[in-house]
């Protein structure tokens, strides 16, 4: 038998600690439930990682202000112990090991990005400590029959589901589509699912191209797609990649009738970074602050947005709302279990049903929820809901005008 060297993140390693912050609570240690997390607070995806740190903190503070979490009639305060993984997946795994074995946190909140959640959930499974995470959507995370990982992002394979439905009804008609995606767990899952969605809907996939994660130069790729005369381009990537794709599309005068992106478009940062060039871009989100979503602690989605922006001076997006619901899920599950025992809380998570500011939470047998994606578009510098679960909400600005005609 030939031995195979396992990836670094599958091995339990001594933990190197970076960027530790611990929320201080003036209660006795035995009256505190500590949630541990490793999040990207520096490095290439820190701009998104901050949503999770901030969402965790504001939600913990909100729950504590309301009296905390009760177990057997006794109130407990929540605390957060969080590390900066510097956008390094191997460091993240070491930090989750540290959180469980040395810091002795009670439960785990997740990182951002599917490749991190895929790796870090190995630790929660090994030590049988429940992790609720709203940063990883790859189908691969939930294909391993793990019992201790729960996720509040919908399956990546269906991210473009609502977008494909929209494409069917556009005039002028969409026929040829380009599918472009990064070479990472999330984006590959998106592409695999979207490929089937497009074929089932009768579209021709004129280009099907993968690029290296964290790519900055898309000129060759864009030129190749441009030569195919596609009507629509669907891009699965992370925010910096998406920004570069738009900027370089403009410089190469690449103007299909439509392009849509998995991330970036719903955020205030996207619109600020691109200015007028953000207009006409389509994207998706599982959450909007205008949605009629009520919860136990903030009241509703709009109040969450108001409090979040007042505290952190930027608008929350679905990453923040998902992160907040992760904390809420633990509060609900702990009270339902009436215990701090990890197995009992895990079992409570598996059967829990409650309304969060992010939407209804109920995990399937794989540990995932399936909220439908909302299609959004930037119109005149503002984010506009185009298609919701019940169909079209507002008319899209389509087709996208040529760059030199704007």
From Swiss-Prot:
Keywords: Amino-acid transport, Signal, Transport. The keyword Cell division does not apply. Coiled coil: none annotated. Pfam families: Peripla_BP_6 (PF13458). GO terms for biological process: amino acid transport. Residues 1-29 form the signal peptide. Gene3D superfamilies: 3.40.50.2300. Component of an amino-acid transport system. Belongs to the leucine-binding protein family. This is Leu/Ile/Val-binding protein homolog 5. It comes from Brucella abortus (strain 2308). The lineage of its organism: Bacteria, Pseudomonadati, Pseudomonadota, Alphaproteobacteria, Hyphomicrobiales.
């Amino acid at each position: 038998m030939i031995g195979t060297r396992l990836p670094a993140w599958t091995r339990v390693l001594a933990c190197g600690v970076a960027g530790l912050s611990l929320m201080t609570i003036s209660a006795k240690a035995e009256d505190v439930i500590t949630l541990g997390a490793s999040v990207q607070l520096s490095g290439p995806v820190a701009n998104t990682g901050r949503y999770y740190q901030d969402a965790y903190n504001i939600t913990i503070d909100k729950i504590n202000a309301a009296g905390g979490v009760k177990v057997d009639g006794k109130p407990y305060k929540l605390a957060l112990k969080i590390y900066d993984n510097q956008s390094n997946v191997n460091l993240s795994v070491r930090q989750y090991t540290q959180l469980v074995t040395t810091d002795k946190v009670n439960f785990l909140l997740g990182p951002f990005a599917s490749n991190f959640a895929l790796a870090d959930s190995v630790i929660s499974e090994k030590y049988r400590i429940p992790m609720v995470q709203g940063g990883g959507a790859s189908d691969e995370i939930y294909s391993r029959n793990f019992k201790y990982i729960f996720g509040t992002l919908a399956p990546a394979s269906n991210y473009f589901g609502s977008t494909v439905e929209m494409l069917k009804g556009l005039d002028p008609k969409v026929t040829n589509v380009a599918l472009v995606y990064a070479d990472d767990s999330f984006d590959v899952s998106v592409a695999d699912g979207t490929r089937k969605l497009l074929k089932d809907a009768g579209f021709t996939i004129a280009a099907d191209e993968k690029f290296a994660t964290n790519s900055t130069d898309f000129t060759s790729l864009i030129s190749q797609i441009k030569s195919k005369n596609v009507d629509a381009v669907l891009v699965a990537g992370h925010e910096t990649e998406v920004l570069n794709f738009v900027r370089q599309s403009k410089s190469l005068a690449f103007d299909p009738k439509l392009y849509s992106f998995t991330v970036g478009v719903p955020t205030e940062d996207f619109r600020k970074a691109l200015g007028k060039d953000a207009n006409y871009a389509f994207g998706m989100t599982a959450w909007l602050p205008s949605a009629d979503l009520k919860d136990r602690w903030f009241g509703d989605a709009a109040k969450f947005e108001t409090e979040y922006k007042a505290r952190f001076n930027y608008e929350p997006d679905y990453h923040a709302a998902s992160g907040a619901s992760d904390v809420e899920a633990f509060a609900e599950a702990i009270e339902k279990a009436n215990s701090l025992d990890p197995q009992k809380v895990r079992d409570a998570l598996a059967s829990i049903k409650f309304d969060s500011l992010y939407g209804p939470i109920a995990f399937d047998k794989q540990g995932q929820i399936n909220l439908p994606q909302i299609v959004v578009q930037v119109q005149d510098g503002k984010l506009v809901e185009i298609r919701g679960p019940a169909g079209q909400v507002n008319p899209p600005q389509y087709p996208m005008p040529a760059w030199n005609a704007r």
